[in-house]
C-alpha cells in the first residue's frame, strides 16, 4: 500500500515542470549496478529522512548512485 501511494504521487508530479536534480548518498549494496527497485527505495528513503518540501519524481541509477529529480517548492 505504501508503494501505491508513492506511485500515485509520482504520477501527479509528472505533470509539473519545475524540477531540479539532486544526488542522494551512495547505495549501500554489494552490487555495483543496483536494480531499479533498489534505486527507487533509496530515493524514497532519502525523501523520508530529508526535506519534506522535496518529493521524489523520477529515478535513474548509475554506478553506486541514485539520482532523484525533485520538485522545488
UniProtKB/Swiss-Prot annotation:
Key words, A-Z: Disulfide bond, Ion channel impairing toxin, Neurotoxin, Secreted, Signal, Toxin, Voltage-gated sodium channel impairing toxin
Answer whether the UniProt record assigns the keyword Secreted to this protein.
Answer: yes
- Localization in the cell: Secreted
Keyword presence, Glycoprotein: no
Q: Which residues form a coiled coil?
A: none
Q: In which tissues is it expressed?
A: Expressed by the venom gland.
GO cellular component term of the entry, any: extracellular region
Can you list the disulfide-bonded cysteine pairs?
Answer: none
Molecular function via GO:
sodium channel regulator activity; toxin activity
Q: How is it modified after translation?
A: Contains 2 disulfide bonds.
Q: Which residues form the signal peptide?
A: 1-20
Give the similarity note: Belongs to the scoloptoxin-15 family.
- Stated role: Voltage-gated sodium channel inhibitor.
Q: What is this protein called?
A: Mu-scoloptoxin(15)-Ssd1a
Biological classification of the source? Eukaryota, Metazoa, Ecdysozoa, Arthropoda, Myriapoda
